C-alpha cells in the first residue's frame, strides 16, 4: 500500500469516549508499524434548541438545550497490510461514529 494514506474521522457526543477510541486507534496503528498524524481536534458543532417550558401560557418562560458533536481527525501514513487488518478487527466503544477514507 505504498503512497496511500488512511484518513479516519471520528465523531461522538461524549469527548471522553471519543478520546479513548482515538487512543486505541493510534496505539493499534503504531504497534503495527504505521506512522500516525494526529489526533487533530476539529471544531465542535453545537446545536441549540429553545422550547417553551409550559405547553399553554408563559411565552417568556423558555428552556434551552444543546447538543455538542465532538470530532477528531487521524491520518495514517503508509499503512501496512497488518495495520489495515488490525484496524478492521478493532472494537470501538458504542456512540463513536467512524468514517474511513483511503
UniProtKB/Swiss-Prot annotation:
One Gene Ontology cellular component: ribonucleoprotein complex
Keywords in alphabetical order: Ribonucleoprotein, Ribosomal protein
GO MF annotations, alphabetized: structural constituent of ribosome; tRNA binding
Pfam families on file: Ribosomal_S10 (PF00338)
Keyword check for Hydrolase: no
One GO biological process term: translation
Superkingdom to which the source organism belongs: Bacteria
Family: Belongs to the universal ribosomal protein uS10 family.
The protein's assembly and partners: Part of the 30S ribosomal subunit.
Alphabetized PANTHER family for the sequence: 30S RIBOSOMAL PROTEIN S10 FAMILY MEMBER (PTHR11700)
Role: Involved in the binding of tRNA to the ribosomes.
HAMAP family assigned: Ribosomal_uS10
Name of the protein described by the UniProt record: Small ribosomal subunit protein uS10
Species assigned in the record: Afipia carboxidovorans (strain ATCC 49405 / DSM 1227 / KCTC 32145 / OM5) (Oligotropha carboxidovorans)
Annotated gene: rpsJ
Amino acid at each position: 500500500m505504498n503512497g496511500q494514506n488512511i484518513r479516519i474521522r471520528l465523531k461522538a457526543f461524549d469527548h471522553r469516549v471519543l478520546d479513548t477510541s482515538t487512543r486505541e486507534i493510534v496505539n493499534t496503528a503504531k504497534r503495527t508499524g504505521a506512522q500516525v498524524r494526529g489526533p487533530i481536534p476539529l471544531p465542535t458543532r453545537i446545536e441549540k434548541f429553545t422550547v417553551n417550558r409550559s405547553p399553554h401560557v408563559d411565552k417568556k418562560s423558555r428552556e434551552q438545550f444543546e447538543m455538542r458533536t465532538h470530532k477528531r481527525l487521524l491520518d495514517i501514513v503508509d499503512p501496512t497490510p497488518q495495520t489495515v487488518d488490525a484496524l478492521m478487527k478493532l472494537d470501538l466503544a458504542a456512540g463513536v461514529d467512524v468514517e474511513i477514507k483511503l
